[in-house]
């Protein structure tokens, strides 16, 4: 899959789930399940409830995503 196919949206962490999964509420009100991208995992980026994040979604499954950035 090409990088251009991903949809990037802003959201807020609602809940922390097992296995570094998170429930994220997007700006448009949808709630998705997201995991941390590999680079964030490698650099030990901590994500807590209430953090503002950028989530990448694929057009094929809009209920799952990947967290690629945590705002300060």
From Swiss-Prot:
UniProt-listed InterPro entries: NA-bd_OB-fold (IPR012340), RNA-binding_domain_S1_IF1 (IPR006196), S1_domain (IPR003029), TIF_IF1 (IPR004368)
Presence of keyword Cell membrane: no
Main location: cytoplasm
Cytoplasm in keyword set: yes
Keywords from the named record: Cytoplasm, Initiation factor, Protein biosynthesis, RNA-binding, rRNA-binding
Annotated Gene Ontology cellular component terms: cytosol
Gene3D superfamilies: Nucleic acid-binding proteins
Pfam families named in the record: eIF-1a
Family assignment from sequence similarity: Belongs to the IF-1 family.
Protein name as it appears in the record: Translation initiation factor IF-1
Organism, as annotated: Shewanella baltica (strain OS155 / ATCC BAA-1091)
Lineage: Bacteria, Pseudomonadati, Pseudomonadota, Gammaproteobacteria, Alteromonadales
């Amino acid at each position: 899959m090409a990088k251009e196919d991903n949809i990037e949206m802003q959201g807020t962490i609602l809940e922390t789930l097992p296995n570094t999964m998170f429930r994220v509420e997007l700006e448009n009100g949808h709630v998705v399940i997201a995991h941390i991208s590999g680079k964030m995992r490698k650099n030990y980026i901590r994500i807590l409830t209430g953090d503002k994040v950028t989530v990448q979604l694929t057009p094929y499954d809009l209920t799952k995503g990947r967290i690629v950035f945590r705002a300060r």
